[in-house]
């Protein structure tokens, strides 16, 4: 799938704009502060109903404007198209529209418009809290395992019930046993989906990484959130007192993690920022390959400031891998000349100049 038209109103410093991107490579260039990243943020908002620059959406709304809106027309892999729209006002009200109908949740947007983000904060996937890596993992499982979302909702409901009981003791023993069984069953299913996904992801990640950088001894492993040699039911039964003291459940899928190690060390402690960026790129490109294998369509990649922390050879290698995905890519940079030689002649490349919040399409930079 790809975006054939994007309309943005009142997002940060962007003037109202409608533009038609290339179905393949789109390069947005301009000075720092011109609004390039805000274009990616608008697309991210359209696909995920949230910003990647702020946990709060209020700063996204342009000063003195009541709401921000983003519309997009998505060309579907199976043919035809879908119209998406999202609006957010200063009171925090969201409206999501899909083909003229109100949508129930942001998950419906994500299913139609799967997005991958690579930006200067990408190193947080390695250095940040386990929650960030769980989000990465579950994004991938969501897009390849149709049963995941329903199971995830069951898990969250059971987990809320148990945590409420731990804090307030509001359930009788019989009811609590029922919810514990549901929690354990849903946890086992989530663990199964995640384990299968990592098994598929690892060889694709390793191959992709080898085409970007040589990092001998780098390993990717999965921790499910409780002792691999014990049943979750036994772990929960043995930790009730501790869980009550903490006020929440200490073991389960909500504690899962991905572990990247270089020899005996955490990869984040050893690798340079440039190497970390390449590892994260390999992970996200590998996810894109799995999405395309599981469904008739590809991810859309948002790559903010691609040249930063990468030398020419690594920039070229990354561009070639993105190109080989045969998907739509939006890339920002200050100087588009740094990406001049990154693409094959037959690959469609659209060039957009962003200046003081205005977007102007210019000629293909290879002409």
From Swiss-Prot:
Compartments, as annotated in UniProt: Cytoplasm
Record keywords: ATP-binding, Cytoplasm, DNA damage, DNA repair, DNA replication, DNA-binding, Nucleotide-binding, SOS response
GO cellular component: cytoplasm
Lineage: Bacteria, Pseudomonadati, Pseudomonadota, Gammaproteobacteria, Pseudomonadales
Name of the protein in question: DNA replication and repair protein RecF
Organism: Pseudomonas fluorescens (strain Pf0-1)
Family: Belongs to the RecF family.
Cited InterPro entries: DNA-binding_RecF (IPR001238), DNA-binding_RecF_CS (IPR018078), P-loop_NTPase (IPR027417), RecF/RecN/SMC_N (IPR003395), RecF_2 (IPR042174)
Physiological role: The RecF protein is involved in DNA metabolism; it is required for DNA replication and normal SOS inducibility. RecF binds preferentially to single-stranded, linear DNA. It also seems to bind ATP.
Pfam families in alphabetical order: SMC_N
GO biological-process terms attached to the record: DNA replication; DNA synthesis involved in DNA repair; double-strand break repair; SOS response
Gene Ontology molecular functions: ATP binding; single-stranded DNA binding
HAMAP family registered for this protein in UniProt: RecF
Residues that coordinate or bind ATP: 30-37
């Amino acid at each position: 799938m790809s975006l054939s038209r994007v309309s943005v109103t009142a997002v940060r410093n962007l003037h109202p704009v409608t533009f038609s991107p290339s179905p393949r490579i789109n390069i947005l260039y301009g000075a720092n502060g011109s609004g390039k990243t805000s274009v990616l943020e608008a697309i991210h908002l359209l696909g995920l109903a949230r910003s990647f620059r702020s946990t709060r959406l209020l700063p996204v709304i342009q000063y003195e404007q009541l709401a921000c809106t983003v519309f997009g027309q998505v060309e579907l892999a199976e043919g035809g198209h879908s119209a998406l729209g999202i609006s957010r006002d200063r009171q925090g009200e969201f409206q999501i529209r899909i083909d003229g109908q109100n949508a129930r949740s942001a998950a419906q947007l994500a299913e139609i418009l799967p997005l991958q983000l690579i930006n200067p904060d990408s190193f947080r996937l390695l250095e940040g809290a386990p929650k960030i890596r769980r989000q990465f993992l579950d994004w991938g499982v969501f897009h390849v395992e149709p049963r995941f979302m329903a199971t995830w909702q069951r898990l969250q409901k059971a987990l809320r019930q148990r945590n409420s009981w731990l804090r307030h003791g509001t359930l009788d023993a019989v009811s609590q046993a029922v919810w514990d069984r549901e929690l354990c069953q849903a946890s086992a299913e989530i663990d199964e989906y995640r384990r299968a996904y990592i098994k598929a992801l690892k060889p694709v990640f390793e191959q992709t990484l080898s085409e970007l950088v040589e990092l001998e001894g780098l390993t990717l492993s999965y921790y499910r959130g409780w002792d691999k040699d014990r049943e979750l039911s036994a772990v929960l039964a043995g930790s009730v007192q501790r869980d009550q003291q903490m006020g929440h459940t200490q073991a389960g899928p909500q504690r899962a993690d991905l572990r990247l190690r270089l020899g005996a060390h955490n990869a984040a402690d050893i690798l340079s920022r440039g190497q970390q960026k390449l590892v994260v790129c390999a992970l996200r490109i590998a996810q894109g390959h799995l999405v395309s294998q599981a469904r008739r369509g590809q991810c859309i990649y948002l790559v903010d400031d691609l040249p930063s922390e990468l030398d020419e050879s690594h920039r070229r290698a990354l561009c070639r891998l993105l190109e080989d995905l045969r998907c739509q890519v939006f890339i920002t940079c200050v100087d588009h000349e740094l990406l001049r030689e990154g693409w094959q002649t037959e690959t469609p490349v659209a060039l957009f100049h962003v200046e003081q919040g205005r977007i102007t399409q210019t000629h293909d930079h290879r002409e």
